[in-house]
Amino acid sequence: MKKTKLFSLLASLIGAGMLFSAQAHAATTLTVYTALEADQIKAYQAAFQKANPDIEIKWVRDSTGIVTAKLLAEKANPQADVIWGLAATSLALLDKEGMLTPYAPHGLSAIDAKYRSAANPPAWVGMDVWASAICFNTVEAQKQGLPKPTSWADLTKPVYAGKIVMPNPASSGTGYLDVSAWLQMMGEEKGWAYMDALHKNIGQYTHSGSKPCKQAATGEFPIGIAFEYRAVKTKKEGAPIDVILPSEGLGWDIEATAIVKGTKNLEAAKKLADFSASKDAMALYEKNFAVVAVPGVAKPDALLPADYEKRLIKNDFTWASTNRDRILTEWSKRYESKSEKKQ
């Protein structure tokens, strides 16, 4: 009888120990909001989880404008732990609303100062730069007798009427970096006049920054205003497009990482922020973008000019963030009629 009780006690202790061990090693789940391209996420997640096997990621992905609006709507009851891959202009807005937890990740000293928030510790830390590019379908252009544009000004020529597609800036970070750049480069009056002229040639405004290049690749529209990652990738996949970088300069933004204020998984969130700023992560970002937040990591791309980074405009992120609502309200009032229907 005593032996039976002893065995029962031992079994209970072993069972309890195994349960405790399982609980101790149970994975922490981070809810991560992102506007990263779907074809980038898998590699980023795999590398992070290889280094942090005790942390799982639950992704919430959409275009920049949608993710930003969702985060703002959840301000009183945040659902995200971390933001990994969202425009710096959006993160600056969230920071102004007091929605981010400042954190200095390991490796911060290697980050170029212009690719992180100015605060110490920073509210957000950059990953990579994405910038304007035009996807030009050479086959369709030849069929339709369309000359190759080389500048933003060229896109207002009557020959391109109905031939151009671009992202809606209220939905797409790519769309907003274009609109913001035109207003900064040309000034408000001339910038809106430019967009009025461009609007006459727009066939559709999409809710995705990648879609215009995809539409150009298939010939649905011969010209798509997109961004260099999608343009270069699409051409390398064999699409009959030329990648055009307009001569006046390129609008751009920074994909960045930030910790959401109020997260219940702060230590795990810090580990993700550490990884995002690491050399290993930069090596992943470099596979997709010509400019990353740590100088000297990115390698030249044969489809982009050697002076690519110098073609980026002098971008005032504070202005772009502070004036975002006003700009989008005015843009929607003028041009929303040509936007595709939301799914």
Q: Where do the model's predicted regions map?
A:
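Periplasmic-binding protein-like
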Residues: A110-A113, V159-P167, Y194-H199, Y205-T206, E237-K261, S276-A298, ...
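Extracytoplasmic ligand-binding site segments that recognize negatively charged/polar headgroups
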Residues: A35, D39-K42, Q79-E220
